[in-house]
């Protein structure tokens, strides 16, 4: 198959299988981590973000979920909701399916490892530009803010940056959305992508789960921002590609089936390692998001 034919086939997959990155809990945990970092060092950014979201065209959605909350509790919840908003509006006019990923083949065949499919890179740049433009409509800047939050989270999920292509998945497994696994012998089959969206999720209430992830998330030292947000973003994506290639796929390829009835069982050690990786990537995303927001909304 030619590269053009392969790209066209992949685009049809992308249209048919929208991919989520992290579950709500993961995105919300990232928002909490970013909020806590800003609350300790850059409270002006929090106030500016609150004021901007007040101009959001989907403000009613936020207001309904913030009802009864005040002070820091309300602010923390707002950051959770901003981070997940692009997933909440999948069925609305604000949806952009291709903004959630930028995929490259990282394991298997080498012939097609060059092309990167998706629009996350251009969407991140576009929304940063809108957010930085103080002459833009406040409603547009508020939407852009939500997408900046979300894309930072999305692109820390390894299967939103890298996927598999080999004889078992000749058109790729499209970041695991075409592959099936089971977390344990008695678990139901799930898409491999879904497994990597939710490795750190807790059972029960998603807000409680997000708080638990944020509390447990590994927050290693992250390099200070370079001053070039796009260059920093490209480094984060490269990290996710490496995690996909070195951690997500190698020990799971034998378990990944191409339909539910062929879903293999992931080793318990793999499931636990995925949880730790998920918590680490969510922690890194939250810390980096806080740095980015502090730069975007400096104190006067």
Where are these regions (language model features)?
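N-terminal, motif-rich segments that launch catalysis or mediate targeting to/interaction with membranes
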Residues: 20-151, 158-300
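Bacterial N-terminal signal peptides that target proteins for export
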Residues: 1-7
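N-terminal signal peptide c-region/cleavage motif recognized by signal peptidases
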Residues: 16-18
């Amino acid at each position: 198959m030619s590269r053009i034919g392969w790209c066209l086939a992949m685009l049809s997959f992308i249209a048919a299988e929208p991919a989520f990155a992290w579950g709500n809990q993961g995105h919300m945990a990232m928002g909490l981590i970013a909020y806590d970092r800003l609350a300790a060092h850059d409270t002006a950014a929090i106030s500016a973000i609150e004021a901007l979201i007040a101009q959001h065209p989907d403000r009613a959605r936020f207001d309904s979920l913030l009802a009864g909350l005040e002070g820091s509790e309300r602010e923390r919840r707002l950051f959770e909701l901003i981070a997940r908003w692009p997933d909440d509006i999948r069925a609305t006019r604000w949806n952009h399916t291709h903004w959630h990923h930028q995929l490259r083949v990282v394991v298997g065949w080498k012939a097609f490892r060059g092309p990167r499919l998706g629009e996350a890179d251009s969407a991140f740049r576009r929304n940063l530009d809108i957010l930085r433009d103080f002459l833009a409509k406040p409603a547009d800047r508020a939407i852009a803010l939500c997408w900046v939050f979300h894309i930072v989270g999305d692109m820390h999920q390894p299967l939103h940056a890298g996927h598999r292509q080999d004889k078992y998945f000749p058109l790729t497994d499209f970041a695991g959305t075409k592959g099936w696994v089971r977390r344990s012998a008695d678990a139901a089959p799930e898409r491999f992508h879904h497994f990597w969206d939710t490795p750190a999720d807790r059972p029960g209430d998603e807000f409680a789960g997000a708080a638990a992830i944020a509390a447990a998330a590994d927050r290693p030292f992250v390099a200070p921002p370079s001053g070039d947000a796009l260059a920093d973003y490209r480094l984060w994506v490269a990290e996710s590609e490496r995690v996909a290639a070195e951690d997500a796929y190698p020990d799971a390829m034998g378990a990944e089936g191409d339909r539910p009835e062929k879903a293999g069982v992931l080793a318990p050690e793999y499931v636990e390692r995925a949880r730790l990786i998920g918590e680490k990537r969510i922690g890194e995303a939250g810390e980096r998001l806080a740095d980015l927001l502090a730069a975007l909304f400096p104190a006067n």
